[in-house]
Swiss-Prot record:
UniProt gene name: Txndc16
Every Thioredoxin domain range: 394-496
One Pfam family linked to the record: Thioredoxin_6
Extent of the signal sequence: 1-24
Species annotation: Mus musculus
Motif (Mediates endoplasmic reticulum retention): 817-820
GO cellular component: endoplasmic reticulum lumen; extracellular region
Cystine crosslinks: 450-457
Organism placement in taxonomy: Eukaryota, Metazoa, Chordata, Craniata, Vertebrata
PANTHER family according to UniProt: THIOREDOXIN DOMAIN-CONTAINING PROTEIN 16 (PTHR22699:SF1)
Stored InterPro entries: Thioredoxin-like_sf, Thioredoxin_domain, TXNDC16
Protein name (Swiss-Prot/TrEMBL): Thioredoxin domain-containing protein 16
Domain notes: Contains a masked and non-functional KDEL endoplasmic reticulum retrieval motif.
Subcellular localization, as worded in the UniProt entry: Secreted; Endoplasmic reticulum lumen
Length: 820
């Protein structure tokens, strides 16, 4: 499991940060010149260098956190220093402005990793990132359930695994896991994820916080069998993980025949209680099976032993079948009569003793999540930053090439900013589109980084990111307003290949258009085609239709027919001119809508509304579209495809105008699993399906359920809706009127920038002065530092020292922000 790379790491790791010249009362970081630093490099030693000119005052907050990390990292054999450039220095690092915001981890003269200093936001993040980089073979980062199963299968019959979920890289929990991996990486395979969906897939009920599982794969010999899992229920701290892993190493069940008060096991040493299942020879095998069941359910919480009554002189009450011994000294053994194994489990859980040292460790858990990347998009972008993208498939524009390109060729332009997380996430989808269109499209895919060319973006009225615009010669640019996904953008591009509107020349061509035969070669063609019918004399109405169609370009195919024989189509589809024909080729339906407006916006709205289905399946993508009508949702929850009876009933009432004051729709729980959570919130449990509800989101928040004892028919549904309007039915729940707000308040970056010059750093420097002599000693005797792995107890001492010396005053504003 261990690689030779880690053996090199055990020889010693040096961490040298290229940082700005910074002075405090006591600087625990060795300050080196580039020449001094490079002359001390040794094979197998790792170093991270940041060069800058003397006098630079940037990154002071980062340096304070780095000084906090010096001693813990030294205990792992990792030394920390900073290097200051001089003006005549010729090193390539000294001349890079970007270097001021990075820390570089080297081994010898080989670069291992670059760390932007903004991800090393505190001492936990520094230690977590450094150990994560060095333990890349011991800790596998996974993102999918398939990855987890693959590792699990490879370990069956060989070794066990420790699997952890943390909210983000660099958190205190991530640090704790990496510290555990440093010690136990030779004994177990570690796997780590930040994907909450993966945690949900393995059956975790509570997913609000970090989790750690022990996978018992060594016992599994059948590859089709899953490894048994044990969840660590304590918070993820270094001490708790150490205790948990130690209990996983202990025997599952021990047999003893001595006084329970005299028994000593690793559980007592770790502060955990002991449970004795009292047995006798006549029932020993059955009692052993019971004890094993209890042991599995109390694994990590208590030690379980089988106590033989027949072979000892201890006076055990005749009817007692369980003995319970607390971890505290001088507490007598408790003899109990518990005739149900569940009672044994609950008794242990209700009498768990929490050691004071755990409370001390727990201080790391009390602070708010201000240091956590609460933006999932930003977190994903950071994790994927090393994945190469074939950017050469799109043309990068500059101030010099932008106008020439968009004026001489049909172009799609992505306006983005490299500092903007959503932009960088969408860039992946944009490149995926380029891959799919390679060699098959006449439209040029381009991109421009607004972080570099802000003037161009401002002139193109780009005020938010990302923005996609289509430029065609002689036409105004068209902005893309769809989902930031490959499929939707591809559809937008392909539909824009078609004229808007399409001029239909004959009745036969019009019929082909309505059947979807004119553009069937487009894989992403729209599900609805619109044909405007006008007499030759309706010039103004035709112009309105053309303008309205241009507003919807890229989302719908529009056509226009205005020949002398247009009355044939008008009569066939029973409509008066001017009119719209809405064709849904996949469903074989053609509907007619009369046009009686003289405003472009009104006609565009008619076109947009006409695209909506009468009884749609609600998805994450289309829900906002239907919510804008501000009408109660008549919502049918289905476990799969909708029952034709329900569809026919609803559509019949729609045609009869009986549901005009509602938005009828349905939700497929297989396609949109979040529907299960919605139903549980409404009913308190998952009710039988299908379920027909009326949800009044916009006024009152009442949720009504159609009676399960009745069949859904036109008559019963209309009667039920009338009862609701008359106030004769009671809601099953009432939704809260509270606003949907972000989980955390927005960062006040100006105040955060001012803070280092006022309170927090000053207090940290004062606290650090208390350790001045210790740090001086550490710097004077670098050779005395052991580079081998520490014993767990030593590792825990480091963690506790770090917690005990954390400035208490700096935590108070954090608590206030969390309350906000």
């Amino acid at each position: 499991m261990m690689s030779s790379g880690f053996s090199v790491f055990r020889a010693g790791v040096a961490l040298v940060l290229m940082c700005s010249f910074y002075k405090s009362t006591e600087d625990s970081l060795p300050e080196l010149t580039p020449q001094q630093y490079f002359s001390t490099l040794q094979p197998g030693k790792a170093s991270l260098v940041y060069f800058c000119q003397v006098g630079s005052l940037s990154n002071s907050v980062f340096l304070e956190e780095l000084k906090e990390a010096v001693k813990p990292l030294q205990d792992y054999g990792i030394s920390v220093a900073k290097v200051t450039c001089v003006e005549e220095e010729a090193s390539r690092y000294c001349g890079e402005e970007e270097g001021l915001m990075k820390a570089y981890l080297f081994r010898g003269n080989i670069l291992l990793r670059e760390f932007p200093t903004d991800i090393l936001f505190d001492v936990n993040a520094i230690i977590a990132h450094v150990l994560f980089a060095l333990l890349f073979n011991e800790v596998k980062y996974i993102t999918t359930l398939e990855d987890l199963h693959s590792i699990e299968n490879s370990l069956k019959g060989k070794s066990n695994m420790i699997f952890s979920y943390v909210e983000a890289i660099g958190t205190p929990e991530h640090r704790a896991v990496m510290e555990a991996a440093f010690v136990y990486g030779t004994s177990y395979q570690f796997a780590l994820t930040t994907e909450i969906a993966l945690l949900e897939n393995i059956g975790s009920e509570s997913i609000e916080h970090a989790h750690l599982y022990f996978f018992h794969c060594k016992l599994v010999l059948d590859l089709t069998e899953h490894c048994r899992r044990t969840l660590m229920e304590q918070p993820l701290t270094t001490l708790n993980i150490h205790v948990f892993v130690k209990t996983m190493n202990a025997p599952l069940l021990m047999e003893v025949a001595e006084d329970p008060q005299q028994v000593s096991t690793v559980h007592l040493q770790l502060g955990l209680p002991l449970v004795f299942i009292i047995s006798q020879r006549a029932t020993q095998e059955a009692d052993r099976r019971t004890a094993e069941w209890v042991a599995w359910h109390l694994l990590g919480k208590a030690g379980v032993l089988l106590l033989l009554r027949d072979s000892m002189d201890v006076n055990i009450p005749q009817h007692a079948n369980v003995a319970f011994r607390r971890a505290e000294k001088d507490v007598p053994v408790e003899f109990l009569v518990l005739n149900d194994v569940e009672l044994i489990i609950s008794h242990v859980k209700n009498n768990m003793h929490i050691e004071e040292i755990q409370e001390d460790e727990g201080e790391d858990m009390e602070g708010p999540d201000l240091a956590v990347e609460d933006d999932e998009v930003a977190g994903t972008v950071y994790r994927d930053r090393k994945k190469p993208l074939p950017l050469e498939l799109s043309v990068e524009l500059t101030e010099e090439t932008f106008n020439t390109t968009v004026m001489t060729s049909d172009s799609i332009v992505l306006f983005y900013a490299t500092w903007h997380a959503v932009s960088m996430a969408f860039l992946q989808s944009y490149i995926d589109v380029a891959i799919k269109l390679k060699g098959r499209s006449t439209i040029l895919l381009t991109r421009i980084n607004c972080a570099d060319w802000s003037d161009i973006c401002t002139k193109q009225n780009v005020t938010a990111f990302p923005v996609v615009k289509l430029y065609k010669e002689g036409e105004s640019p068209v902005s893309y307003a769809g989902m930031l996904a490959t499929k939707d953008l591809l559809k937008f591009i392909q539909l824009n290949k078609i004229s808007c509107p399409v001029n239909i020349a004959s009745i036969q061509e019009a019929e082909k258009y309505l059947r979807g035969e004119l553009y069937k070669d487009l894989p992403s063609s729209a599900s609805v085609s619109v044909l405007g019918l006008f007499s030759p004399a309706m010039a103004s109405a035709k112009e309105l239709f053309r303008e309205a169609g241009k507003q919807l370009r890229g989302s719908v195919i529009t056509g226009i027919y205005s020949e002398d024989d247009v009355w044939i189509l008008s009569n066939k589809y029973a409509t008066t001119l001017p009119a719209l024909l809405l064709a849904r080729p996949k469903e074989g339906r053609i509907e007619s809508v009369p046009l009686d407006t003289t405003l472009v916006q009104d006609m565009a709205q008619i076109l947009a509304n006409a695209l909506l289905e009468a009884f749609p399946e609600i998805t994450v993508e289309n829900l906002p579209t239907y919510l804008r009508f501000q009408r109660p949702l008549l919502l049918l929850f289905s476990g799969g495809s909708i029952n034709p009876q329900y569809r026919n009933t609803i559509l019949a009432l729609v045609r009869q105008k009986q549901l005009d004051s509602f938005t009828p729709c349905w939700l497929n729980l297989k396609n949109t699993p979040v529907g299960r959570g919605i139903l549980k919130a409404y009913f308190g449990r998952l009710p039988p399906l299908p379920q027909l509800l009326l949800v009044n989101l916009h006024s009152g928040g009442q949720v009504y359920a159609f009676p399960s004892s009745q069949s859904v028919t036109e008559q019963s549904l209309v009667l039920w809706l009338k009862h609701l309007q008359a106030g004769l039915e009671n809601p099953i729940t009432v939704l809260s009127a509270q606003e949907w707000k972000p989980p955390l308040p927005a960062f006040d970056f100006l105040n955060m920038m001012d803070a280092p010059t006022s309170q927090a750093p000053t207090k940290k420097v004062l606290e650090c002065q208390k350790e001045a002599e210790v740090q001086e000693s550490a710097e004077l005797q670098p050779g005395d530092r052991s580079t081998a792995r520490r014993e767990p107890v030593e590792m825990l001492r480091i963690k506790r020292w770090n917690t005990a010396n954390w400035p208490k005053d700096t935590q108070e504003p954090f608590h206030h922000d969390k309350e906000l």
